[in-house]
Amino acid sequence: MPKEKDGVIYTINLRRLYWGRRSNRAKRAVRMVREFVARHFGVEPEDVKIDNTVNNYLWSGSITKPPARVQVYVTVKTESGEEGERKVAYVTLANVKDVED
C-alpha cells in the first residue's frame, strides 16, 4: 500500500463489463473503479471519492458503452471526524502532464 499523500497511477481494465448485459454498464463501471481502489488501498468502498472527471469519462459512451479501460490517479489522505480517523481515497482522471509536476 502506498504511503499517505503519495499518488499512484492505475490502469483499470473494464473489459469484463462487456461480458454482462448491456444495460447499466456505466453504472457498473463506476462500481468496479470504486471496488478496485478500495481493495488496493485498504479502505472501505464508501470512503472512495471519485472525481467528476472520472465519472464523466466513464459515462462518455452512454450507459451501454463505457470505455474498456481507464487510467486513474489515486491519493489517500487521513481525515478525522466524529467517528475518529479514517482513510479516504481520492480518484481523479490521470493526465500524465499534470501528475508528473
Curated annotation (Swiss-Prot):
Superkingdom, natural source: Archaea
InterPro entries: Ribosomal_eL31, Ribosomal_eL31_dom_sf
Gene3D superfamilies to which the protein is assigned, alphabetical: 3.10.440.10
Keyword Ribonucleoprotein: yes
Keyword Ribosomal protein tagged: yes
Any Pfam family the entry gives: Ribosomal_L31e
Keyword terms, alphabetized: Ribonucleoprotein, Ribosomal protein
GO CC, alphabetical: cytosolic large ribosomal subunit
GO terms, molecular function: structural constituent of ribosome
Membrane-spanning parts: none
GO biological process, one term: cytoplasmic translation
Stated family: Belongs to the eukaryotic ribosomal protein eL31 family.
Official protein name in the record: Large ribosomal subunit protein eL31
Species annotation: Ignicoccus hospitalis (strain KIN4/I / DSM 18386 / JCM 14125)
